[in-house]
């Protein structure tokens, strides 16, 4: 964001996209972001000031100097910080408003929703020593290539498959950290389907009768390097969950690379890698609730390959919008800082494709 973009016609259009001046004033008062107008005269001025600080990377002093120079408002850097800390709920409401305006669309009757998370470091030294993070949990929707949901937490909140509300009929794609049986059951109960990557020892594999299912033995005996069969996974709360196991043997080159990465990770973490892990590295393993009658194994594998699109979504957030670790150590200021970047991403999404050299989803593999 540049100073000009806060002053020209783009700013007027931004206000309109956020519901107009009257709606912004109402939401600012409802969330107590704006209570009086002695210095900062209107919520519109407050929003302009907060976005200039969060997106302009000027710092508090430079932002207030800029605001004074253009005749926007004359306040101290301390006063700006105070107002910023009151804006978290307001900015969250505005992000929600933009998300609601573009409710997910369907693709061939089904919404494809990719779950993932990204993080930015906390600013203070103690947090950095303790790997302190702000974590942004997201749902990235296809074919619209838009973020459909955001949830902001710190490093104490882990990635969870059901953290983002389910849109009935969606197909939820997620990596192996989301192989969480009880949370998978929650998504299915709310009307979604799942395609989740699996590791050989992430869960307790079972047969229909409750006996243990030896996944590695099944991989060893797979015909033509493929598996497509029912499987059950044990749950902590409730009966075992029936899913569909799909596995395909990797190419020699891909398998060798996977084994190399597994050995390197074991060396880094200081443990002896098992032969079972090396054997499983030769395979790409998924579980899904999609039926074979509706989706072939090739269809399911093709769906999962779409996960690379969310990486481009996070690229937009960090390179195009410029999100990095927020300054300061206080959650009350870090939260609005991150929300301001999410707000700007949503405002720019209709035109952001023109800024990138990546192909559109419709032309992707």
What are these regions (language model features)?
Residues 104, 113-115:
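Short glycine- and basic-residue-enriched patches
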Residues 62-69:
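Short alpha-helical "recognition helix" segments of helix-turn-helix
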Residues 90-104:
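Short Lys/Arg-enriched helix C-cap and helix-to-coil transition segments
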Residues 1-57, 65, 74-75, 79-87, ...:
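Single, function-defining residue in the core of a domain
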């Amino acid at each position: 964001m540049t100073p000009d973009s806060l002053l020209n016609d783009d700013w007027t259009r931004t206000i309109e996209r956020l519901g107009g001046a009257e709606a912004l004033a109402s939401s600012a008062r409802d969330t107590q972001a704006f209570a009086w107008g002695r210095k900062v005269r209107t919520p519109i001025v407050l929003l302009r000031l907060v976005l200039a600080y969060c997106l302009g990377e000027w710092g508090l002093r430079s932002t207030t100097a800029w605001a004074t120079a253009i005749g926007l408002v004359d306040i101290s850097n301390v006063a700006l910080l105070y107002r910023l800390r009151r804006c978290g709920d307001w900015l969250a409401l505005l992000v929600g408003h933009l998300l609601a305006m573009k409710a997910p669309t369907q693709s061939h009757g089904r919404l494809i929703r990719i779950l993932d998370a990204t993080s930015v470091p906390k600013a203070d030294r103690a947090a950095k020593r303790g790997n302190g993070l702000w974590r942004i949990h997201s749902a990235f929707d296809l074919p619209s290539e838009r973020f459909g949901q955001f949830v902001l937490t710190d490093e104490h909140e882990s990635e969870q498959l059901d953290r983002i509300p389910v849109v009935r009929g969606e197909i939820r794609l997620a990596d192996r950290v989301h192989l969480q049986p009880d949370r998978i059951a929650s998504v299915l109960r709310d009307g979604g389907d799942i395609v989740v990557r699996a590791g050989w020892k992430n869960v307790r594999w079972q047969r229909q009768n409750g006996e243990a299912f030896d996944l590695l033995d099944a991989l060893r005996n797979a015909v033509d390097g493929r598996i497509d069969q029912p499987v059950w996974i044990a749950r902590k709360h409730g009966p075992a969950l029936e899913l569909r196991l799909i596995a395909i043997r990797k190419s020699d080159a891909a398998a060798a690379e996977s084994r190399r990465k597994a050995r390197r990770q074991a060396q880094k973490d200081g443990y002896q890698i098992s032969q079972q892990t090396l054997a499983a590295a030769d395979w790409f393993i998924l579980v899904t609730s999609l039926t074979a009658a509706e989706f072939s194994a090739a269809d399911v594998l093709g769906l999962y390959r779409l996960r690379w699109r969310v990486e481009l979504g996070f690229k937009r957030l960090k390179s195009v919008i410029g999100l990095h670790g927020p300054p300061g150590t206080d959650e009350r200021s870090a939260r609005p800082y991150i929300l301001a970047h999410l707000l700007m991403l949503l405002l720019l999404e209709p035109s952001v494709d023109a800024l990138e050299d990546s192909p559109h989803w419709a032309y992707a593999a």
